[in-house]
Amino acid sequence: MKKVLLTLAVIVAGLSVTVLDINAQNKSGKTKFQQEMQKWHQDMEEFRARSAERREINELTDSIAGVQAAAAVLNRDFVLEADQVTFKNGNTVFVNSSTTFISVKGNRAVVQISPSNFAAGPNGVGGVTVDGSISGMQQMVDKKGRTTISFNVMGIGINAQIEIYMTPGTNQASATIYPNFNSNTVWIDGNIVPYENSDVFEGMSL
């Protein structure tokens, strides 16, 4: 009988130790999981803080660029550097902003469309360059703060009306070029920068 009781006592003691070990493991597992979750939450908070800081920096950069662009337009001393051109047939081409642009310097405008990186074109840089005198320049701001600049350009190789639309608070802009003697309208998208800050390369004019 004593032997049986002793055996039972050993078994119970073993079970108790096993239960304690399991509880300890569960507690350790929970603690590790809680630590991992806490670290994840901390990482997420740091990520959100960095993202918010980057957004603020980007917004500030856009705002400064927008102010500079607005001043340059007002002074007739700007370049719309294009990164995308859309033709009348709907084809859209991504272009080099240093070779596709509209520049305004005082009463002179240059329109250069260079959609090709493979063919030299008439201007030597993959497209066409035309320049001329500006007339009838107007600047309008609507109720939503969107600015539209319109003017005519007349020269040996160009006779067109140009409308430029500026995105409020940034230097982003798009333009429509309406030739007066044909319907080959061209649309470009890009950014407006002060003339002296532009690094465009002007090809040979027609």
Which role does the model predict for each range below?
Residues 1-31:
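Bacterial Sec-dependent N-terminal signal peptides
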Residues 92-146:
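Mid-length scaffold segments of soluble, non-membrane domains
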Residues 83-85, 105-107, 114-116, 154, ...:
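Solvent-exposed coil/turn segments that connect beta secondary-structure elements
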Residues 69, 100, 162-164:
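Residue-level detector of beta-strand structural context in well-folded domains
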Residues 26-37, 137-206:
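Helix-rich interaction surfaces within compact, conserved domain-sized segments
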Residues 72, 103, 110, 165-167:
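Well-ordered beta-strand positions
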Residues 87, 118, 158-161:
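Short beta-strands and strand-coil junctions in structured, solvent-facing domains, enriched
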Residues 34-89:
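N-terminal leader/targeting segments and the immediate start of mature chains
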